[in-house]
């Protein structure tokens, strides 16, 4: 190859590489409106270090803590886990109209209320704001997020009553409001949750009153009402043909005849009724619950012999003690 041709080829290669950066700049996938919204969120969080990859000169689809849709290249996920954020949730989060998933989890310095701007997120399916320091009332407008499937506000400082509108989303499958400071009664509207195989967590609050009978119309897979101040008869939650796997009702003031209870025999793996005012005896049908792994009826007013069979004798005496006159293995024999 002649020296002239070599120099020409080298010049061509250098010229080609020189224009590559300008080509890359014009090929950014991130939507400009989404990028501006994210940068406003970063500014509201005082340029938190956890968001340091959010650089205005780079493609936001390549940033950490967010995810772009593979086709539209719009931001569909905002996820910041385990610290790094302080202040309140910026209203600019509502300026990401294609968001489907929000996960702000274990942010002890995340405070304030849930902003009303989230109402604009009509595509939102998963909203997790757990293990933070959010406070104030739970906003009823969350029930207007029609595509919501999973709502988790657990481990915060929310107060006030449970909005009846939270059961409105037609595909809601999981509602977690546990570990807050909620008061008042359980709204009857929660008996209209329509999502398949629903989960309901209301434990560790200050809820009062009776469990609405209409909750028995919902085939909950998991229900936890423990550690409240609830009373009355929650036995509509039970049923031989229900699909419940875990039922936690401990440390309330429930009062019903356990002898008449029909446990979900094919699916139940956990039943905790300790520290209530439950009377009667343990039904023989409990011996047919073949997958039972957690069982506790201690600190109630039960009497009679513990039925023999199934898994009932695999639990130690602490699952049965401090009842009125319960007897039989693993307790003392009946006289």
Question: Where are these predicted regions, by residue range?
Answer:
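Tandem repeat domain/solenoid detector
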Residues: 98-100, 116, 120-125, 131-140, ...
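LRR flanking "cap" motifs
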Residues: 43-91, 253-260, 328-335
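Leucine-rich repeat
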Residues: 64-65, 69-150, ...
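The feature encodes a structural signal of leucine-rich repeats
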Residues: 89-91, 111-116, 135-140, 159-164, ...
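Surface-exposed cap/linker segments adjacent to membranes
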Residues: 2-65, 315
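Leucine-rich solenoid repeat scaffolds
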Residues: 284-335
């Amino acid at each position: 190859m002649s020296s002239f041709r070599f120099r020409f080829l080298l010049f061509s290669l250098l010229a080609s590489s020189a224009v590559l950066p300008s080509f890359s700049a014009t090929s950014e996938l991130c939507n400009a409106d989404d990028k501006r919204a994210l940068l406003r969120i970063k500014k509201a969080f005082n340029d938190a270090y956890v968001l340091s990859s959010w650089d205005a000169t780079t493609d936001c689809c390549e940033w950490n803590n967010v995810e772009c849709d593979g086709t539209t290249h719009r931001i569909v996920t905002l996820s910041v886990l385990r610290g790094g954020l302080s202040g309140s949730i910026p209203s600019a989060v509502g300026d990401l109209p294609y968001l489907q998933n929000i996960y702000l989890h274990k942010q002890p310095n995340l405070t304030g209320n849930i902003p009303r701007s989230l109402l604009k997120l009509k595509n939102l399916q998963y909203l997790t704001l757990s293990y933070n320091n959010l406070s104030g009332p739970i906003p009823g407008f969350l029930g207007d997020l029609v595509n919501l499937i999973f709502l988790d506000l657990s481990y915060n400082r929310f107060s006030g009553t449970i909005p009846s509108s939270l059961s409105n989303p037609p595909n809601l499958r999981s509602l977690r409001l546990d570990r807050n400071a909620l008061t008042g009664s359980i709204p009857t509207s929660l008996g209209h949750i329509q999502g398949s195989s629903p989960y309901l967590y209301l434990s560790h609050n200050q809820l009062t009153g009776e469990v609405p009978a209409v909750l028995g119309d919902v085939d909950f897979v998991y229900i936890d009402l423990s550690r409240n101040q609830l009373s009355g008869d929650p036995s509509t939650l039970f049923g031989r043909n229900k699909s419940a796997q875990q039922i936690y009702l401990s440390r309330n003031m429930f009062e019903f005849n356990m002898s008449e209870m029909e446990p979900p025999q094919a699916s139940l793996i956990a039943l905790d009724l300790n520290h209530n005012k439950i009377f009667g005896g343990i039904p023989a049908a409990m011996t047919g619950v073949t997958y039972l792994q957690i069982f506790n009826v201690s600190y109630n007013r039960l009497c009679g012999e513990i039925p023999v069979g199934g898994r009932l004798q695999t639990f130690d005496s602490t699952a049965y003690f401090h009842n009125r006159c319960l007897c039989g293995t693993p307790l003392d024999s009946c006289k």
